[in-house]
């Protein structure tokens, strides 16, 4: 038995983590990346040039790299990488240059460019997102995702978020960011502990910042949430 919830927008599609039940009756989380071979995902991704926004946190429930999984199953043509680099080895606040990994272009989004350029986006048809947030506002991965969504909207590129649970759960706590203090470290008026998964954040800013071209919804059963389903 599995619960499935997908939020659909003309720009944005979120493949939420789901809850499944093992033979012993125990619940376990199925990550968005765990579902890339399902028919719904294949309809979204097959036959398209894929970009992937990720780093070392992009792994499935068996700790297999999302980069390698997408490269194996689909046409992965470019990687887009936030602060700290592809493997988390770059110090906080330190910029890094674009490079290649296993013959795939790796575009730095924490160097000369903080946003994907039109030239970068020319390499892809769809941007896939699989990255782990930590559940607090002052973390630059959310900002990089927001910039990706804005530039993909301009270029009319679809964004598919492979969701994963918020490690701090779904509760919100702490002061809300004041507009006059917005920076790349905190772009939106969210509480310090925001309670959102990265997919929920993407859906939220797509609606509130009017990034996409209208919002619709669909799915079967329940799921999502700060706990992943």
Residue ranges and their predicted role:
Residues 7-18:
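Bacterial N-terminal signal peptides
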Residues 28-74:
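N-terminal phosphate-binding or glycine-rich loops at protein starts, especially the Walker A/P-loop
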Residues 74-75, 152-158:
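A short helix->loop->beta-strand "cap" motif at the edges of active sites that frequently abuts
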Residues 77-85:
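Short internal beta-strands
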Residues 88-93, 160-182:
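Glycine-rich, charge-decorated loop segments at or immediately adjacent to ligand/cofactor-binding or catalytic sites
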Residues 92-124, 136:
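Glycine-rich oxoanion-binding loops at beta->alpha junctions
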Residues 133-145:
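Glycine/threonine-rich flexible loop motifs
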Residues 182-222, 227-229:
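Conserved anion/nucleotide-ligand pocket segment
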